[in-house]
């Protein structure tokens, strides 16, 4: 189980990404549309004024059951450990053990 502080930090990042997504997208679009060098610098400064954690790149996928950041399967939103346990218990519909 991940530390609660790390899980909460990720939740905070998710909230910030959602809050500033429209503003960040508008600034990026304005940056690409700008032709004047000075204007681009000003837009870039405005982008830098946004909180660091509002950037989608700073988010980390975490298992929603345990909070584990590594071994994450996007299709399920689970870490490899939980995926294996739940698949063996039959808690994941459609997941069957491979045999050939």
From Swiss-Prot:
UniProt KW keywords: Ribonucleoprotein, Ribosomal protein, RNA-binding, rRNA-binding
GO molecular function: rRNA binding; structural constituent of ribosome
Keyword Transferase: no
Gene Ontology cellular component annotations, sorted alphabetically: cytoplasm; small ribosomal subunit
Family (UniProt): Belongs to the universal ribosomal protein uS14 family.
Reported function: Binds 16S rRNA, required for the assembly of 30S particles and may also be responsible for determining the conformation of the 16S rRNA at the A site.
Subunit note: Part of the 30S ribosomal subunit. Contacts proteins S3 and S10.
UniProt cross-references to InterPro entries, sorted A to Z: Ribosomal_uS14, Ribosomal_uS14_bac/plastid, Ribosomal_uS14_CS
Protein name: Small ribosomal subunit protein uS14
Gene Ontology biological process: translation
């Amino acid at each position: 189980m991940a530390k609660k502080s790390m899980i909460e930090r990720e939740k905070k990042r998710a909230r910030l990404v959602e809050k500033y997504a429209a503003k960040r997208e508008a600034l990026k679009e304005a940056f690409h549309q700008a032709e004047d060098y000075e204007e681009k610098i000003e837009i870039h400064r405005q982008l830098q004024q946004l909180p660091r954690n509002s950037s989608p790149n700073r988010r980390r996928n975490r298992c929603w059951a345990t909070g584990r950041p590594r071994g994450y399967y996007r299709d399920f939103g689970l870490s490899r450990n939980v995926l294996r346990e739940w698949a063996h218990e039959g808690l994941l519909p459609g997941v069957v053990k491979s045999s050939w």
